[in-house]
Regions:
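A cross-kingdom feature marking charged/low-complexity
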Residues: 183-201
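N-terminal Sec-pathway targeting helices
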Residues: 1-24
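Surface-exposed patches in mature extracellular/periplasmic domains of secreted proteins
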Residues: 87-91, 103, 146-157, 194-197
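Hydrophobic alpha-helical membrane-insertion segments, chiefly the h-region
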Residues: 22-33
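Low-complexity, Gly/Ser/Thr/Pro-rich intrinsically disordered linker/tail segments
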Residues: 199-223
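Export/targeting segments at the very N-terminus of extracytoplasmic proteins
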Residues: 32-99, 129-131, 137, 194
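Acidic helix/loop microenvironments that form the catalytic cleft of cell-wall polysaccharide enzymes
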Residues: 94-97, 116, 139, 149-175, ...
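Substrate-binding/active-site groove segments that recognize
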Residues: 104-124, 135-138, 180-183
């Protein structure tokens, strides 16, 4: 029996050796060539289809103003980087700056997400879009933790600070109550994938248009 098994093993050995050589030397080369071809095809997709990368990956609602949609690709990247819903980031940017990365408030809030100076580390460029987004997103995540994941309450926290989470809305500052109203309704429309937002239109009519006009000038989008 042992001799029979030995003969079978010796008969199959060359085939096993050939298979191992194929796996070690041939398969990696073939796989690399296949992946390289696939990569080249993917690289050519924008030219073949006329669709740019940013258009393919756009995930924010289409009703946000042109000034906010100008930052679409960055919003998507920041959302992934800081584990946030891109529509939530877009809603905060819409209300805070309408996409004007140079704007500052009388209270000292800076940039796209109107981040207060005490959130920044010494020496940081407070209006740099990536730095501003990092600090704004970090604080928004803090607010989501305080609000136990409630995005509307997190936006109120973003405006009024963490202490408002434990207070009834009747004790909030009027600015925070307005922020909560605008933010929650605009974000709700975005979550429903609407093409238009009555809430955003109301915000624009209540004074948001002026902010967006300034943003358009800053971004070179005004006619």
């Amino acid at each position: 029996m042992k001799k029979q098994l030995k003969r079978i093993f010796l008969r199959l050995l060359p085939g096993w050796i050939a298979l191992m050589l194929l796996i070690v030397f041939v398969l990696p080369t073939a796989l690399a060539a296949t992946l390289g071809t696939t990569g080249r095809i993917l690289d050519q997709l924008p030219y073949l289809t006329g669709v740019t990368v940013s258009e393919r990956i756009s995930v924010i609602a289409p009703f946000f103003t042109e000034e906010v949609r100008h930052w679409d690709e960055e919003i998507n990247r920041w959302a992934q980087q800081y584990d946030l819903d891109p529509n939530l980031l877009a809603t905060v940017m819409q209300i805070e700056s309408c996409g004007d990365w140079t704007v500052s408030s009388p209270a000292g809030a800076q940039g796209l997400f109107q981040v207060m100076p005490f959130h920044f580390a010494a020496g940081e460029n407070q209006i740099d879009p990536d730095t501003n987004a990092m600090r704004g997103a970090n604080f928004l995540n803090v607010c989501l933790d305080y609000s136990e994941g409630d995005p509307a309450l997190a936006m109120a926290c973003y405006n009024g600070g963490q202490t408002i989470v434990s207070k009834p809305s009747s004790e909030w500052a009027s600015e925070t109550r307005r922020y909560y109203q605008w933010g929650s309704t605009i974000y709700a429309d975005a979550g429903l994938s609407k093409d238009t937002s009555p809430a955003l239109q109301s915000w624009l009519e209540a004074g948001g248009t002026y902010l967006c006009d300034l943003a358009a000038q800053s971004l070179g989008l005004s006619g």
